[in-house]
Amino acid sequence: MPGIHDNVIVLDFKSLYPSIIRSFHVDPLALIEGLIEDNAIEGYDGGLFSRDKYILPELIEDLWVARDRAKANSNEVLSQAIKIIMNSFYGVLGTIGCRFFDSRLVSSITKRGHEIIIQSKEYIEDKGYQVIYGDTDSVFVLLGDVKK
């Protein structure tokens, strides 16, 4: 919905791609080949991820805690550096030259992110609001007339 609008809020998912890696165990070590585990986490494009064997989700968890600590200490430089490191995991996994490149890893991140944005849009619209824009990790919601 192009144009300039009043009363719009932006709902931004905090570190969406790192959150997906952490929550859904998207990790080269966790990528299941051969026998399928009963309780595997389903990814996309054939990706299945172990609930027990992984590295990146733990690294991201540690970085997340460190970033929250940096923010609590008003250390914006460190907080931003940690954010860049966390986001770089997705970038590295999506690089063909990376030793751990596998299209199932990146598609399990991007397609899960897309699914989350679409589900959020549907939820918001079911509540009677209009989503006027969405991107990789946020949606813009038109609130309509707001009484002063």
Task: Please state what every model-predicted region is.
Residues M1-K148:
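Conserved acidic
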